[in-house]
């Protein structure tokens, strides 16, 4: 349910991540210091900009691209990256398209990308860098060792943030079972959950850019976060005003700047509590998050429970007969819910000690 920021850039990075045939070809050109200009796509719009060169129409291979880059012109690849269509070609984009690039190769790449919306790759001969253009996007590919170092640093930061989130959530769990949770406790947990998810999004981008070299980072990330996002959404569902859509609230929280996210009063307004003191306002959870922790309870049954009882404390105080009357709950499931909540409470109180 995360808003997919930079989705287009992520797709580009996947195509040319380390380990892919395209990246191998680009690295070969980079090491040879010949420079190069590659365009990915074979639409009529692209081919109209191509002048001269040799029609190759050969299977793509990193070594072929490397050899063809020794010539001055650009290389045109098919959109599926399976064929080299032509080499040593001159690209003639519309010169009225604005560009802030300086070198001829990069100016051409920028204009072609803006005119056609295709991926164009410029490899600088002197600066030894690979720049990717697509539409208005410009991105400089970085060396894997640099990205790996940043990803590891981000993982260490994430570990600390997850530890803080765990403490905040464990405290909220105790308060929920005692029915003395305040608005301050709730918005702090929502805030911490969003902070963790923002670091996760950053690491996911690094993993995407690392390609097959990012497998270990991906495994560490999966181990660290587990159900953080799901719990964050259930927190919002537990405490937002009943006339509000939790999905809209979650999107709104994601849209906050880093400074706005630090403002707990602003967060409380987003979940529907305006002009009330954070510390003195007691609120009861609906029970989505806690009941969700009980094994083998389907989501539709949880919905029915919340609709019938409206608060977690009412579910806990309900008799087996009252639970049995809820649609989708029989005698066995009523016992599972009662026993499950009792065990959860005992476990949370033990963890406190």
UniProtKB/Swiss-Prot annotation:
BP-aspect Gene Ontology terms: DNA repair
Enzyme Commission designation: 2.7.7.85
InterPro entries assigned to the protein according to its UniProt record, in alphabetical order: DisA, DisA_sf, DNA_integrity_DisA_N_sf, DNA_integrity_scan_DisA_link, DNA_integrity_scan_DisA_N, DNA_integrity_scanning_protein, RuvA_2-like
Required cofactor(s): Mg(2+)
Keyword terms, alphabetized: ATP-binding, DNA damage, DNA repair, DNA-binding, Magnesium, Nucleotide-binding, Nucleotidyltransferase, Transferase
GO molecular function: adenylate cyclase activity; ATP binding; diadenylate cyclase activity; DNA binding
Class of the enzyme per the UniProt entry, highest EC level: transferase
Catalytic reactions on record: 2 ATP = 3',3'-c-di-AMP + 2 diphosphate
Binding site for ATP: 73, 91, 104-108
DAC domain boundaries: 6-144
Listed SUPFAM superfamilies: RuvA domain 2-like (SSF47781), YojJ-like (SSF143597)
Oligomeric and partner information: Homooctamer.
Similarity section: Belongs to the DisA family.
Described function: Participates in a DNA-damage check-point that is active prior to asymmetric division when DNA is damaged. DisA forms globular foci that rapidly scan along the chromosomes during sporulation, searching for lesions. When a lesion is present, DisA pauses at the lesion site. This triggers a cellular response that culminates in a temporary block in sporulation initiation. Also has diadenylate cyclase activity, catalyzing the condensation of 2 ATP molecules into cyclic di-AMP (c-di-AMP). c-di-AMP acts as a signaling molecule that couples DNA integrity with progression of sporulation. The rise in c-di-AMP level generated by DisA while scanning the chromosome, operates as a positive signal that advances sporulation; upon encountering a lesion, the DisA focus arrests at the damaged site and halts c-di-AMP synthesis.
NCBIfam families: PRK13482.1
Protein name, per record: DNA integrity scanning protein DisA
Organism of this sequence: Clostridium botulinum (strain Loch Maree / Type A3)
Phylogenetic lineage: Bacteria, Bacillati, Bacillota, Clostridia, Eubacteriales
């Amino acid at each position: 349910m995360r808003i997919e920021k930079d989705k287009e850039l992520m797709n580009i990075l996947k195509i040319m991540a380390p380990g892919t045939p395209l990246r191998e070809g680009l690295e070969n050109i980079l090491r040879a210091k010949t420079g190069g200009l590659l365009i990915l796509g074979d639409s009529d719009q692209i081919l109209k900009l191509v002048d001269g060169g040799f029609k190759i129409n050969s299977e793509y291979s990193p070594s072929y691209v490397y050899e063809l880059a020794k010539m001055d012109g650009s290389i045109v690849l098919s959109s599926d990256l399976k064929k080299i269509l032509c080499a040593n070609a001159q690209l003639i984009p519309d010169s009225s398209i604005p560009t802030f690039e300086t070198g001829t190769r990069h100016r051409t790449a920028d204009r072609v990308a803006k005119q056609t919306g295709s991926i164009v790759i410029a490899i600088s001969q002197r600066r030894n860098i690979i720049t990717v253009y697509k539409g208005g996007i410009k991105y400089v590919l970085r060396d894997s060792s640099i990205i790996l170092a940043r990803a590891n640093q981000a993982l260490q930061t994430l570990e600390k943030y997850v530890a803080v989130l765990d403490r905040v959530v464990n405290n909220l769990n105790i308060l929920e079972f005692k029915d003395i949770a305040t608005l301050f406790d709730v918005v702090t947990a929502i805030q911490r959950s969003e902070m963790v998810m923002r670091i996760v999004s950053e690491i996911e981008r690094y993993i995407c850019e690392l390609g097959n070299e990012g497998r270990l980072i991906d495994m560490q990330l999966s181990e660290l976060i587990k159900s953080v996002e799901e719990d964050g959404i259930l927190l919002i569902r537990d405490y937002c005003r009943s006339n509000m859509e939790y999905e809209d609230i979650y999107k709104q929280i994601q849209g906050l700047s880093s400074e706005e996210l630090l403002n707990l009063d602003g967060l409380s307004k987003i979940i529907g509590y305006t002009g009330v003191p954070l510390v003195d306002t007691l609120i009861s959870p609906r029970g989505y998050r806690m009941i969700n922790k009980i094994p083998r309870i389907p989501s539709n049954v949880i919905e029915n429970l919340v609709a019938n009882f409206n608060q977690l404390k009412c579910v806990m105080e309900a008799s087996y007969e009252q639970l049995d009357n809820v649609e989708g709950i029989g005698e066995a499931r009523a016992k599972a819910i009662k026993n499950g909540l009792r065990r959860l409470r005992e476990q949370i109180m033990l963890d406190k000690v």
